[in-house]
Amino acid sequence: LLFQTYAYIGSRSIYSVVSILNRDIAKLKFVSGVEVTEEDYKLSGTEFQFPDLHLTPEQLGNRQKWIIESILRIWIQQPQVAFLILEYLIEFGILNPQYLIRKALDPDSNLIINNVSCMESINRVLSTCAVGESSKEVILLLFNLIVENLNYTLGKIGVENPETEEVKIITEFSEEDKNDTELMAKIDLQWLFYEYRGLLKTYLRKFNLQHSDYSKEIEDIFESIQNKPVKSDVMRLIKELTY
């Protein structure tokens, strides 16, 4: 409710949200479960200091997820506003970017594929994180989740030989077939698989990680791609980008 109140202020001006976040940063960090620093107390202009909650990783994660869900819920009709507010929460250190990335790549919603505002927001977050201290953690998480979603979607498509068979999208069907819910669901999954494959290659090109100090860890993640045609395609792209 607290974060929804701050998010609602965004209906007047997004800059009003930024101003209030800056003013109440100590309180908001405490509620979100992250560490409150001396600088945060100075910015908030308060001498009162919050107690250490000693949260477990699970408890911290739950708080971070509640923040994301509460803001997306209140701005369900204007996702661009919701994601912009979430970006500001990350900028102020109130929200860990990894939780937003997990939400964007949740296979139950596939927001990064289905919502343009989400993809644009994640791209901005990734660009910022890529030059920060948490770049390795964020990038590894990103690729790991994409590969997990590829494998998960592959399993749901029902390909006869999922490891060796190339996933093709059914593009020709009759008017009568349009009423076949099972067929239409399968085509949706084929497109989803295709979209995640494209997303993986896009981010590979974007970050050019072949010369990073964790390129081996990236390749290990790609080795877990279950569909060999996709794995071969990705590995070939890595070699092309290396030279």
PLM regions and their residue ranges:
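Long alpha-helical repeat solenoid scaffolds
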Residues: 1-243
